[in-house]
Amino acid sequence: MTRAMYMSKLYAPTLKEDPADAELASHRLLLRAGMIRKEAAGLYSYLPLAWRSIRKIENIVRDEMDTAGAQELMMPIMVDAELWRESGRIDAYGKELVRFDDRHGREFVLGPTHEETVTALVRNELRSYKQLPVNLYHIQDKFRDEFRPRFGLMRGREFIMKDAYSFSATQESLQEEYDKMKQAYANICERCYIKALPVVADSGEIGGDTSVEYMALADAGEASLVYCDDCGFAADDEAASTKVVVTEGPGDGTLTKVETPGMGTIEAVAKFFGFPENGTRKSLALIDAEGKPVVAIVPGDHELNDCKAEHVFGKGYRMMTDEELQTYGLHKGFIGPVNLPEGIRLVCDESLRESKQWACGANEVDYHFTGACPERDFTVDEWADLVTVVAGDPCPHCGKPLSAARGIEVSQVFQLGTKYSEAMGATFMDEDGKEKPLIMGCYGVGVSRSLAAVVEQHNDEHGIVWPISVAPYEVAVIPLDPKKEECANVCDQIVEGLCAEGIEVVVDDRDERPGFKFADNDLMGFPYQVVLGKRGLKNGTVELKDRATGEREDVAIDEVVAKVAELVKAARR
């Protein structure tokens, strides 16, 4: 037995117009449907309808985590900063970490993740291999002081996340926990009706050697990914790596200096030589994290990948300013590896290693070289994976052309290994009585992000189209003339019957025009609508509408409860 909610009492202030600052469909529709409200940049209140959906997502997550053998607990949001110093992450995390002092001058952080907290929690308790493996999780608000919060719930400063942490005695045991979590996450996406693709991902500040993200495919997604239709490979643009096919530059292989007046762009140089941009070499002048000058060279038709560059040049690397270019004797648009001024480190993309005929800047205004050859004409200090992989590049597994898409990261799994346990002294005794560091995994689901991802994938020109598993209510009963006794009586009869069947019902009993009610209910997106109109009541029928398909049918009043209950229960399965 459930209890119906009446819209005359429901706090769901809808909006007729799209908010000016809402870029994504999910942001726009959640605001318009009266489900969230912005309090400050990156900070949102979840109103009753959204909160019901959030709770449903949380319960799906709980069910899958519990089924996989994980145990729920709750750790504090406020974390002693000393734990972050132990792990070495307090400075590496940067300004996104919210830090503050308590009244006694002791420093704390607001947890964006809880690796340090959970490691400290178990390090004096999990002391024997007999206690392992253990997988602990909680669902909690997290905090990250994003430089540019945007896209509504997609990139906020406060967000809801489920984070889990496993502790194992062996790598094989970690792999088992990792595989369980991957399956649980696939199940969560399926049950929430999120079409997601598991993609190889970079581990970022969390660390570890192996990571997979679950990306909800969406044209307006904030993340880029590439995938192979032939073998199933997929990776986000931060982790995607392949041997980019490059074209040899123009010329006969002899180092030749060519005047290229005013041609300081790849496009202009390629056009001048009548050659594809892939046959040119793009030189980028950088300052690494230690403040030292670097020139990075990539194929002319590819871009330097920021995440990969951070691994090579350090977090905080940046492009040189015009003043720094002048200081180091470099000329924008004409930088190249030949005759590079002394003291500048040269790092080239791995895909260029076999190329022997480069078209590149000559380190002189209005001049380029053709036929430049590594080792013969210049020395490369380091070869590294630097470029963003794009559609058309070869799949690293099967060699077929990759496709590109955009997505929303809804969850991610990591094999952390011993990064935190070694740093924080979390050890156990193995079967041979030897002390070893705990082997860890961590697993996150963005609960509030998942809400946005559902809306991003399930909407139309009229509003949200909720999948039944996460809909705030399953059925909207819409009496068009609720003050009329006959209409009110039939409404009560239907509502009582649906509630008795365990159906979640919202009743639009507001004294508003039919058109207003129809528009609002379509905007809010409840899966089924039961409309009580004057003409239908005269004929002993009500109209049943499927929000997803738009299909309508007249159903006898005394049959509608059974009909709707059957539809809802079938959809739940």
Regions found by a protein language model. Name each.
Residues 1-573:
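NTP/phosphate- and nucleic-acid-binding module
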